[in-house]
């Protein structure tokens, strides 16, 4: 065994003096930014949505908090942020968000003066001092006037919390004809200092985190903001250009493999001060590789010389590590078994609901759809018609999950958006990651809606459905006999007679509150949860409380417009997988539910049950 001075000769890294450049990887910060930008493009681990005008952008809270003091104060409690359209447009914010994730400012298709003036206004509003300094330098070189100081307009035109919670229901692609509503109107050259900006900064903060934000209440141009803009994408049909917002496309573009640099120790914080010197920005003739990140140049277009903010990429890494925190995890999703409890005791053995991994659009839930591939920045339809987007129309976005809560309010609390999908991402994301494997139903493709039980053939499903129907008819007709009603009594007698013995023997578990009976204890426990007074699962957006995590997760999809289950045939999206199963029968023409009295066939079980009630109701 080697010891003494010889050991140091074999281990030169044992002393601090030897830990020099050989132990650093200069491209580590670039690799980190590249990976973060790719994750944003795919929507992976994105935990905040920013709405600007009618455009939706997904991002990471940690990255926004490390780049802007303004965002840092908002993402503490909000998962949905609505920016003031008087201060920033969707096109400008696309450039700013690209810059935050790349550290590069590429030329846009707009004239230089209005674009930089607008960027300066938006950068001051979002408290991005580096971008503001860069815009001032560009305007100064061009001899254009600009505001002498940094504007602080954090509270001007800010919508209320209730306004921020509203989102449009129809998610559409951004078409090439879309233009900025503020295009052609120069941005205000100087805005008054906002006295109420602190109210905006600390809106909704709790006492626990108020001390964390007290040091942030300076002027709009904070000490540690980092921002900027990159090219303005216009949704060209070439597919090379991407808008890195929420990807609601049916298929996601493949993500080329990249080799991230090895992890290194945090860089020297002194880089931050170096990058904030208002010195002329050096130019570079190369942008990020097209294969490894979102492309910033139109197909067939010759890009102008890109601009780099000095040390921006290194500062991105320093700021991310300097925040001392990790991104908030999105809602936990775990695959649990699903039981359907209706008003009448109808239940079967649980059946594992599994995600098929397909993607598409939900039609209202069955009236909406997106047939085209949607870029990563998406447009929620507005009231204006015309153009390709007019075919989609506009609908209000009620919380339809709340209506479903009345039908299946006792679903398993462990059920959530993922419902057993891939381990790479939760099912409330609508994008595929590299290596994602689709999970199929196997042979049990015929699913009973109330109890979620699967069967390999429609005949077996019909036989199973009859047990539900007989039980419901027995309960209904039992009340009819007691009231002395005639007419359909004799007709329903054949159905109700065998169900009486069946229900007496197969439902030994009784609820202690309402005395309803169930087949198994698991279903009974789910029913008993409906009687609980406590609601431990709140919605992070509107604050509504739920007794079960799965119900709360589906409710949040209404706010975020996320519909993870899609039809491969037409691209329609659904928030619930059983609705996708029902919808697929529209394409196949299958009607597995048949009335035993008249022979009528139906695609959905609830239609059959309603039809049978017509037979048994007194005429």
Curated annotation (Swiss-Prot):
<dbReference type="GO" id="GO:0005634">
    <property type="term" value="C:nucleus"/>
</dbReference>
<feature type="zinc finger region" description="C2H2-type 5">
    <location>
        <begin position="593"/>
        <end position="615"/>
    </location>
</feature>
<feature type="compositionally biased region" description="Basic and acidic residues">
    <location>
        <begin position="337"/>
        <end position="357"/>
    </location>
</feature>
<dbReference type="InterPro" id="IPR000210">
    <property type="entry name" value="BTB/POZ_dom"/>
</dbReference>
<dbReference type="GO" id="GO:0005886">
    <property type="term" value="C:plasma membrane"/>
</dbReference>
<keyword id="KW-0863">Zinc-finger</keyword>
<dbReference type="InterPro" id="IPR013087">
    <property type="entry name" value="Znf_C2H2_type"/>
</dbReference>
<comment type="similarity">
    <text>Belongs to the krueppel C2H2-type zinc-finger protein family. Hic subfamily.</text>
</comment>
<feature type="zinc finger region" description="C2H2-type 2">
    <location>
        <begin position="509"/>
        <end position="531"/>
    </location>
</feature>
<feature type="domain" description="BTB">
    <location>
        <begin position="46"/>
        <end position="109"/>
    </location>
</feature>
<feature type="region of interest" description="Disordered">
    <location>
        <begin position="180"/>
        <end position="293"/>
    </location>
</feature>
<feature type="region of interest" description="Disordered">
    <location>
        <begin position="307"/>
        <end position="426"/>
    </location>
</feature>
<keyword id="KW-0678">Repressor</keyword>
<comment type="subunit">
    <text>Self-associates. Interacts with HIC1.</text>
</comment>
<keyword id="KW-0805">Transcription regulation</keyword>
<dbReference type="InterPro" id="IPR011333">
    <property type="entry name" value="SKP1/BTB/POZ_sf"/>
</dbReference>
<comment type="function">
    <text>Transcriptional repressor.</text>
</comment>
<dbReference type="InterPro" id="IPR036236">
    <property type="entry name" value="Znf_C2H2_sf"/>
</dbReference>
<dbReference type="Pfam" id="PF00096">
    <property type="entry name" value="zf-C2H2"/>
</dbReference>
<feature type="modified residue" description="Phosphoserine">
    <location>
        <position position="166"/>
    </location>
</feature>
<feature type="zinc finger region" description="C2H2-type 1">
    <location>
        <begin position="446"/>
        <end position="468"/>
    </location>
</feature>
<feature type="modified residue" description="Phosphoserine">
    <location>
        <position position="349"/>
    </location>
</feature>
<keyword id="KW-0862">Zinc</keyword>
<feature type="modified residue" description="Phosphoserine">
    <location>
        <position position="169"/>
    </location>
</feature>
<feature type="modified residue" description="Phosphoserine">
    <location>
        <position position="197"/>
    </location>
</feature>
<keyword id="KW-0677">Repeat</keyword>
<feature type="zinc finger region" description="C2H2-type 4">
    <location>
        <begin position="565"/>
        <end position="587"/>
    </location>
</feature>
<feature type="compositionally biased region" description="Gly residues">
    <location>
        <begin position="214"/>
        <end position="228"/>
    </location>
</feature>
<keyword id="KW-0238">DNA-binding</keyword>
<feature type="modified residue" description="Phosphoserine">
    <location>
        <position position="416"/>
    </location>
</feature>
<feature type="zinc finger region" description="C2H2-type 3">
    <location>
        <begin position="537"/>
        <end position="559"/>
    </location>
</feature>
<protein>
    <recommendedName>
        <fullName>Hypermethylated in cancer 2 protein</fullName>
    </recommendedName>
</protein>
<keyword id="KW-0597">Phosphoprotein</keyword>
<feature type="compositionally biased region" description="Polar residues">
    <location>
        <begin position="281"/>
        <end position="293"/>
    </location>
</feature>
<dbReference type="GO" id="GO:0005654">
    <property type="term" value="C:nucleoplasm"/>
</dbReference>
<keyword id="KW-0804">Transcription</keyword>
<dbReference type="Pfam" id="PF00651">
    <property type="entry name" value="BTB"/>
</dbReference>
<feature type="region of interest" description="Binding to CtBP">
    <location>
        <begin position="247"/>
        <end position="249"/>
    </location>
</feature>
<keyword id="KW-0539">Nucleus</keyword>
<dbReference type="GO" id="GO:0008270">
    <property type="term" value="F:zinc ion binding"/>
</dbReference>
<keyword id="KW-0479">Metal-binding</keyword>
<dbReference type="GO" id="GO:0003677">
    <property type="term" value="F:DNA binding"/>
</dbReference>
